[in-house]
């Protein structure tokens, strides 16, 4: 691979659900809103704003909008061939409870031009039931899963 110019880029995708719009258009992301939202989560509270900006630059960021105001976000880290990590799935608390979060996850996992991947992973402390609806399961062989935490 000569340079990052060879990086896979999917065509933009947009879909609607009532008054909500899901979009993969990077310019629509309200970065300030997303940073504030993620810093308030249990998984993002130890990040910095710069870490979040950098993570957005190196992944596929999806936005959820209600009348053009950002109310949700999801992010995919992938090689576009075999593996993807779903992360930073967040919906504004005022918008929860009306299936829009489930719809956003569905849109994120089923992007029209995303190749069929061998494996998707995610980490969640409290949303296992939501992700089971999309085929996620506890690891069949947890002894094969390892992780490393850098400080």
Annotate each PLM feature.
Residues 3-47, 142:
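Short amphipathic alpha-helix that is part of the acyltransferase structural core
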Residues 50-90:
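A conserved beta-strand-loop-helix scaffold within acyl/acetyltransferase catalytic domains
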Residues 95-104:
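Conserved acetyl-CoA pyrophosphate-binding loop and the N-cap/start of the following alpha-helix
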Residues 103-110, 114:
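Hydrophobic, well-ordered beta-alpha structural blocks that scaffold small-molecule cofactor pockets
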Residues 114-150:
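Conserved active-site alpha-helix within GNAT-family acetyltransferase domains
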């Amino acid at each position: 691979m000569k340079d990052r110019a060879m990086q896979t880029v999917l065509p933009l995708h947009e879909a609607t659900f009532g008054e909500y719009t899901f979009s993969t258009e990077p310019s629509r992301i309200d970065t300030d809103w997303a940073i504030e939202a993620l810093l308030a989560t249990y998984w993002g509270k130890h990040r910095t704003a710069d870490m979040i900006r950098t993570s957005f630059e190196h992944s596929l960021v999806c936005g959820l909008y209600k009348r053009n105001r950002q109310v949700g976000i999801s992010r995919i880290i992938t090689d576009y061939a075999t593996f993807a990590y779903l992360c930073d799935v967040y919906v504004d608390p005022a918008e929860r409870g009306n299936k829009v979060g489930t719809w956003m996850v569905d849109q994120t996992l089923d992007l029209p031009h995303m190749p069929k991947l061998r494996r998707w992973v995610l980490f969640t402390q409290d949303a296992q039931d939501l992700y089971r609806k999309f085929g996620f399961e506890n690891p069949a062989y947890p002894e094969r899963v390892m992780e490393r935490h850098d400080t």
